[in-house]
């Protein structure tokens, strides 16, 4: 299935190339990234963008490494670093744009006090967001990590690093895009902001608790290759993404569920 999806995506990218050879090809998650890029396109019509919405299961960093796109906009810096190691590639951060606070959600409970002994908690199964979820659970008094796990950006935690789990919570590692579907089956679910939005949730209203924006190391970034980092189109897109107009758009459209770095 993924091979068919990747093939279809390759055909889509090729058709974009045929339509506009000079357009900047940017791979993006549908929400909020592609929506933000669409606003940029309206804001700056002289900057030609080909926004390629990436389906779940397709690695935008592989597309970038292979030259199928010129940039991508979907990830945070810790995840990018893990991808550079996994793919043996070096990428370049062109702009730091917004934060999508990770949130803890529940369809069963309205407060953490209601979570029972041996309750179930769904968390992302990729390394960086799994660690991020554990730090958020710790920040809300549900678990305690071992000494030495102090910096979420540097000290990546796994369930083996839980020192105290007073409610004997069962940590279930699930593919990030699938976690919203598990809400009815678990006591708590830790969901990335973009997947919460895609599922029709409002992080600012529906989450029991969100990550704090101040000092958050998980800001979403525009990424390109070292070869293209000085491309005028990349520089203009980075400038647009960090503009007051885009910050205002993000603030008004997402109402605290997505936070522009400019007003963090």
Regions found by a protein language model. Give the residues of each.
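Short, polar/charged alpha-helical segment
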Residues: 23, 27-52, 59, 63
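Periplasmic-binding protein-like
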Residues: 95-106, 131-138, 197-238, 241-264
């Amino acid at each position: 299935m993924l091979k068919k999806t990747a093939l279809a995506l390759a055909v889509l990218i090729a058709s974009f190339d045929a339509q506009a050879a000079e357009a900047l090809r940017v791979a993006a998650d549908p929400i909020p990234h592609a929506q933000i890029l669409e606003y940029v396109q309206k804001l700056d019509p002289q900057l030609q963008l080909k926004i390629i919405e990436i389906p779940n299961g397709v690695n935008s960093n592989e597309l970038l490494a292979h030259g199928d796109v010129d940039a991508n906009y979907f990830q945070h810096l810790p995840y990018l670093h893990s991808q550079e190691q996994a793919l043996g590639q070096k990428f370049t951060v062109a702009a730091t744009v917004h934060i999508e606070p990770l949130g803890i959600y529940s369809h069963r409970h309205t407060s953490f006090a209601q979570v029972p002994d041996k309750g179930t908690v769904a968390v992302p199964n990729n390394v960086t967001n799994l660690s991020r979820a554990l730090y958020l659970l710790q920040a809300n008094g549900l678990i305690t990590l071992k000494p030495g796990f102090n910096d979420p950006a540097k000290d990546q935690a796994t369930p083996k690093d839980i020192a105290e789990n007073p409610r004997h919570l069962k940590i279930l590692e699930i593919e990030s895009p699938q976690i919203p579907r598990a809400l009815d089956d678990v006591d708590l679910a830790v969901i990335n902001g973009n997947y919460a939005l895609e599922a029709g949730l409002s992080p600012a209203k529906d989450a029991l608790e969100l990550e704090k924006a101040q000092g958050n190391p998980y800001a979403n970034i525009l990424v390109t290759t070292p070869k293209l980092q000085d491309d005028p189109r990349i520089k203009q897109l980075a400038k647009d993404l960090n503009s007051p107009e885009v910050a205002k758009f993000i603030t008004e459209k997402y109402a605290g569920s997505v936070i522009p770095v400019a007003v963090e």
